[in-house]
């Protein structure tokens, strides 16, 4: 397994991109918009997503701020097969909260589990890891 990204919800995507790129020296790796589900994404990091963990900045259209209680999104891990990973996690007492399947609006196969504290961990099939929504 490999750490892929950490998602942060932001109230102003351009302000956040400027901070991570100009202040912290990260590169803007890619952006996308999903008009159907009304959100925009920006991925920033120090290297390519295929080699380095990155930050996913998510702007939900019309939402300008979050309280710290809901600002955390998830940690993502690369797995060879999401369904098999879910089964191994379940067999070891883990809590699978979303079975392996395509992400909304795309074809990338993902699943979600929770750690003992309830933090969400996304499992992304390695073959799809750098494809975003799989478009």
Curated annotation (Swiss-Prot):
Q: Does the keyword Oxidoreductase apply?
A: no
**Which cofactors?**
Ni(2+)
Cross-referenced SUPFAM superfamilies: Glyoxalase/Bleomycin resistance protein/Dihydroxybiphenyl dioxygenase (SSF54593)
List GO terms (cellular component aspect): cytoplasm
What Pfam families does the record point to?
Glyoxalase
Classify the source by domain of life: Bacteria
Q: Where is the VOC domain?
A: 2-126
Q: Which residues bind Ni(2+)?
A: 5, 56, 74, 122
**Catalytic center at which residues?**
122
Q: Describe the reaction catalysed, as an equation.
A: (R)-S-lactoylglutathione = methylglyoxal + glutathione
Instruction: Give the pathway listed in the UniProt entry for this protein.
Output: Secondary metabolite metabolism; methylglyoxal degradation; (R)-lactate from methylglyoxal: step 1/2
What Gene3D superfamilies does this protein's entry cite? 2,3-Dihydroxybiphenyl 1,2-Dioxygenase, domain 1
For substrate, which residues are the binding ones?
Answer: 9, 60, 74
Keyword set includes Lyase = yes
Q: Which InterPro entries would you find in this protein's record?
A: Glyas_Bleomycin-R_OHBP_Dase, Glyas_Fos-R_dOase_dom, Glyoxalase_1, Glyoxalase_1_CS, VOC
Report keywords, A-Z.
Lyase, Metal-binding, Nickel
| PROSITE patterns in the record | GLYOXALASE_I_1, GLYOXALASE_I_2, VOC
Assembly and partners are described as:
Homodimer.
The record's function comment reads:
Catalyzes the conversion of hemimercaptal, formed from methylglyoxal and glutathione, to S-lactoylglutathione.
**Family according to the record:** Belongs to the glyoxalase I family.
Protein name in the entry: Lactoylglutathione lyase
